[in-house]
């Protein structure tokens, strides 16, 4: 695993410099990673919701939000405040415990998955050696929460929506994992930092999208299905199921579903950026940038510039994919449930298996180009 800056140790040493003991410093550190992840996830959601409203308005030749702040940038905050003050209703015949636990099981694994997303060589909360495996494991918890919410609502539309959500998630989880496995095979690591580092040799030409074009398409299609974005929004199809598993929810419980959906979309876009688009890497080699500045690669100026712009590059790549996902919402029709399951089991799964086998063969035949 690539060595990186130990954020916990650096934080503890800084506090010890102010006279705090090592134990006190570590105690203060404990809640900070999750707080940072939560803030980053919420900010990402606010930006994405505003972008979706404005882009959707542009596609439909409308103006969109414009009164809540300049260009309507405060509209997502207004939406959140509205949901915060709405009454929290639990249906009379619903299972109260499962009804409350369902949204929590949906949103918590998605937020925890942000722990493994690197925004730079040393800029991540936790450089877990099995980060990809951790993310896949956490994402497999979400269908349980969706099915639980649909069942606990004691509503036929909610139950059908929960069953659809669970079936859809399971169907697309497997080809998604196989697509990621091909990338892991090339980088020889389950660490997201190592996967990005493997793509930083020759700028844009090193990105995995050129060596894994089929895997990239499989991953992106499966990610959209996991996020329940059009054309894969069958679990909450308004014309068929009212609002699916969300039908009986209101107030902050509904807000958790809303939040989880957008956090998952931004997370999926960030992971595509990390796995296939070079993450924090520049489109040109860093050596070229250092040459233009007349500095060595290890010079402090070059390190500061690459560190700052690495964050920008990761976010820009991710939001380009978010933009594409928003456009797809308004340009593609919803598929039927049988078409959705056929696509996952009869097309994407065999294609992902073939892609994995071809990647293994190419790794043996061309070890330098495919990470042998």
From Swiss-Prot:
<keyword id="KW-0472">Membrane</keyword>
<feature type="transmembrane region" description="Helical">
    <location>
        <begin position="97"/>
        <end position="117"/>
    </location>
</feature>
<comment type="subunit">
    <text>NDH-1 is composed of at least 11 different subunits.</text>
</comment>
<feature type="transmembrane region" description="Helical">
    <location>
        <begin position="166"/>
        <end position="186"/>
    </location>
</feature>
<dbReference type="InterPro" id="IPR001694">
    <property type="entry name" value="NADH_UbQ_OxRdtase_su1/FPO"/>
</dbReference>
<dbReference type="GO" id="GO:0031676">
    <property type="term" value="C:plasma membrane-derived thylakoid membrane"/>
</dbReference>
<keyword id="KW-0793">Thylakoid</keyword>
<keyword id="KW-1133">Transmembrane helix</keyword>
<feature type="transmembrane region" description="Helical">
    <location>
        <begin position="204"/>
        <end position="224"/>
    </location>
</feature>
<comment type="similarity">
    <text>Belongs to the complex I subunit 1 family.</text>
</comment>
<dbReference type="InterPro" id="IPR018086">
    <property type="entry name" value="NADH_UbQ_OxRdtase_su1_CS"/>
</dbReference>
<feature type="transmembrane region" description="Helical">
    <location>
        <begin position="347"/>
        <end position="367"/>
    </location>
</feature>
<feature type="transmembrane region" description="Helical">
    <location>
        <begin position="128"/>
        <end position="148"/>
    </location>
</feature>
<protein>
    <recommendedName>
        <fullName>NAD(P)H-quinone oxidoreductase subunit 1</fullName>
        <ecNumber>7.1.1.-</ecNumber>
    </recommendedName>
</protein>
<feature type="transmembrane region" description="Helical">
    <location>
        <begin position="308"/>
        <end position="328"/>
    </location>
</feature>
<dbReference type="GO" id="GO:0019684">
    <property type="term" value="P:photosynthesis, light reaction"/>
</dbReference>
<keyword id="KW-0812">Transmembrane</keyword>
<dbReference type="GO" id="GO:0016655">
    <property type="term" value="F:oxidoreductase activity, acting on NAD(P)H, quinone or similar compound as acceptor"/>
</dbReference>
<comment type="function">
    <text>NDH-1 shuttles electrons from an unknown electron donor, via FMN and iron-sulfur (Fe-S) centers, to quinones in the respiratory and/or the photosynthetic chain. The immediate electron acceptor for the enzyme in this species is believed to be plastoquinone. Couples the redox reaction to proton translocation, and thus conserves the redox energy in a proton gradient.</text>
</comment>
<dbReference type="GO" id="GO:0009060">
    <property type="term" value="P:aerobic respiration"/>
</dbReference>
<keyword id="KW-0618">Plastoquinone</keyword>
<feature type="transmembrane region" description="Helical">
    <location>
        <begin position="27"/>
        <end position="47"/>
    </location>
</feature>
<dbReference type="GO" id="GO:0003954">
    <property type="term" value="F:NADH dehydrogenase activity"/>
</dbReference>
<feature type="transmembrane region" description="Helical">
    <location>
        <begin position="266"/>
        <end position="286"/>
    </location>
</feature>
<keyword id="KW-1278">Translocase</keyword>
<keyword id="KW-0874">Quinone</keyword>
<dbReference type="Pfam" id="PF00146">
    <property type="entry name" value="NADHdh"/>
</dbReference>
<keyword id="KW-0521">NADP</keyword>
<dbReference type="GO" id="GO:0048038">
    <property type="term" value="F:quinone binding"/>
</dbReference>
<keyword id="KW-0520">NAD</keyword>
């Amino acid at each position: 695993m690539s060595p990186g800056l130990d954020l916990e140790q650096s934080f503890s040493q800084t506090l010890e410099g102010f006279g705090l003991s090592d134990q006190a410093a570590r105690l203060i550190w404990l809640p900070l990673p999750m707080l940072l992840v939560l803030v980053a996830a919420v900010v990402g959601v606010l930006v994405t919701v505003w972008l979706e409203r404005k882009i959707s308005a542009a596609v439909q030749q409308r103006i969109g939000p414009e009164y809540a702040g300049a260009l309507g940038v405060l509209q997502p905050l207004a939406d959140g405040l509205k949901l915060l003050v709405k009454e929290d209703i639990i249906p009379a015949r619903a299972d109260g415990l499962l009804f409350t636990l369902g949204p929590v099981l949906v949103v918590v694994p998605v937020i925890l998955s942000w722990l493994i997303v690197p925004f730079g060589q040393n800029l991540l909360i936790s450089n877990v050696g099995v980060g990809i495996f951790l993310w896949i494991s956490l994402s497999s918890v979400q269908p349980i929460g969706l099915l639980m919410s649909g069942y606990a609502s004691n509503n036929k539309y909610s139950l059908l929506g929960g069953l659809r959500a669970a079936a859809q998630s399971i169907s697309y989880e497997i080809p998604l994992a196989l697509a990621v496995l091909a990338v892991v095979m090339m980088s020889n690591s389950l660490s997201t930092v190592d996967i990005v580092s493997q793509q930083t040799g020759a700028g844009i030409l090193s990105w995995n999208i050129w060596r894994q074009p089929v895997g990239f398409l499989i991953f992106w299609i499966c990610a959209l299905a996991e996020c329940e974005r059009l054309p894969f929004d069958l679990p909450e199809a308004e014309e068929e199921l009212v609002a699916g598993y969300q039908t009986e929810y209101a107030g902050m419980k509904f807000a958790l579903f809303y939040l989880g959906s957008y956090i998952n979309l931004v997370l999926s876009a960030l992971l595509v950026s990390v796995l296939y688009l070079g993450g924090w890497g520049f489109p040109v080699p860093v050596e070229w940038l250092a040459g233009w500045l007349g500095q060595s690669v290890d010079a402090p100026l070059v390190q500061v510039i690459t560190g700052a712009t690495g964050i920008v590059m990761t976010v820009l790549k991710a939001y380009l994919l978010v933009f594409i996902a928003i456009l797809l919402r308004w340009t593609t029709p919803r598929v039927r449930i049988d078409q959705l399951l056929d696509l996952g089991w009869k097309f994407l799964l065999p294609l992902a298996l073939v892609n994995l086998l071809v990647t293994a063969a190419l790794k043996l035949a061309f070890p330098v180009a495919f990470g042998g």
